[in-house]
Amino acid sequence: MPNIKSAIKRTKTNNERRAHNATIKSAMRTAMKQVETFVSNNEADKAKAALSAAAKKIDKAAKKGLVHKNTAARYKSNLAKKVNGLSA
């Protein structure tokens, strides 16, 4: 446990940020799983709508530095391939 006042404040801030970042990453993962569910159930319209929502959450996570921009691009690309495979 830190003794210096500024270190105590930083610890508190870090814990708050970690919790906030975890909720954003969790929402991103949930959105991705929702797309996967619609794809596995062959629901093309719902999958496309969920894909745009998931892409938005993935981009937000990348913008905040929670995932690397190339990782975000890979996530979106893989989801898009699966959704586009439904309509083909």
Curated annotation (Swiss-Prot):
Q: What keywords is this UniProt entry annotated with? A: Ribonucleoprotein, Ribosomal protein, RNA-binding, rRNA-binding
Q: Which InterPro entries match?
A: Ribosomal_bS20 (IPR002583), Ribosomal_bS20_sf (IPR036510)
Give any GO molecular function from the UniProt entry: structural constituent of ribosome
GO biological process terms, alphabetically, are:
translation
What is one GO cellular-component annotation here? cytosol
> In its keyword annotation, does this UniProt entry include Zinc-finger?
no
Pfam assignment, any one: Ribosomal_S20p
What does this protein do, in the record's words? Binds directly to 16S ribosomal RNA.
Family membership = Belongs to the bacterial ribosomal protein bS20 family.
Q: What is this protein called?
A: Small ribosomal subunit protein bS20
Its taxonomic path starts at:
Bacteria, Bacillati, Bacillota, Bacilli, Bacillales
- The protein's gene is named rpsT
